């Protein structure tokens, strides 16, 4: 295709798309609304990623560097698509930074937003300082400061991880499974136990859905090697 391809979103999917296109000689225009590339893993301060175990800043940082240095990728950060019109093979795009470009196709890789746990007040998030989200724990780990109780900075002796908060829940109109939270939680539990071997970690679950090869690597390993306790319950 002689015209560049528009990519909306500079997270992992958008970065992978830009790199894949460049490998076959196809130019692209990547538009990201944040002031930097990387998406949720970078902007939210993720720790180690599943299933590779790489630190987010290293894995995603490598993807960002590869795209930024590629002459076939034109990057626009702190920008949005203001206008998009035309027909397949001939679209006109106006970017909020003033750039106008003609593209042949568009790839939407706009990412996601984390569930706001304030919408499940029964678990005390937003009321009790030591009730935190997975993302907040990820930030504690990735900062290098370790997992601590926000209320007073002490090392926790017991941690309960509640699964399916914000998913598989008809009361809030979210009946679907996220497909990744069980695995992420098992990984997080192992990270907590690795840092705090005297801390007891409990995972409360409806069903464990560690899809594919994740069952052995995360579900069973977290129990057998790290002694994480799983408790079946309807939270």
Language model features with spans:
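Short, flexible loop segments at the rims of nucleotide/cofactor-binding pockets, characterized by
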Residues: 51-53, 90, 208
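Rossmann-like dinucleotide/flavin-binding elements
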Residues: 1-43, 84, 99-100, 111-212
């Amino acid at each position: 295709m002689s015209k560049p391809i528009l990519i909306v979103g500079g997270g992992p999917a958008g970065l992978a798309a830009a790199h894949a296109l460049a490998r076959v000689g196809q130019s692209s225009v990547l538009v990201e609304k944040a002031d930097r590339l990387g998406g949720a893993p970078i902007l939210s301060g993720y720790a180690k990623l599943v299933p590779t175990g790489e630190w987010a800043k290293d894995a995603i940082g490598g993807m960002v560097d590869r795209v930024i240095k590629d002459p076939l990728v034109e990057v626009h950060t702190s920008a949005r698509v203001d206008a998009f019109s035309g027909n397949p093979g001939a679209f006109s795009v106006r970017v909020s930074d003033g750039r106008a470009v003609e593209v042949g196709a568009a790839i939407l890789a706009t990412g996601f937003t984390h569930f706001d746990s304030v919408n499940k007040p029964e678990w005390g998030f937003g009321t009790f300082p030591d009730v935190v989200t997975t993302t907040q724990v990820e930030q504690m780990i990735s900062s290098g400061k370790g997992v601590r109780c926000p209320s007073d900075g002490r090392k926790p002796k017991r941690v309960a991880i509640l699964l399916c908060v914000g998913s598989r829940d008809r009361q809030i109109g979210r009946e679907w499974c996220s497909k990744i939270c069980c695995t992420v939680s098992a990984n997080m539990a192992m990270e907590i136990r690795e840092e705090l071997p005297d801390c007891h970690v409990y995972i409360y679950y409806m069903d464990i859905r560690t899809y594919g090869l994740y069952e052995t690597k995360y579900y069973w390993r977290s129990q057998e090697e790290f002694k994480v306790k799983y408790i079946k319950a309807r939270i």
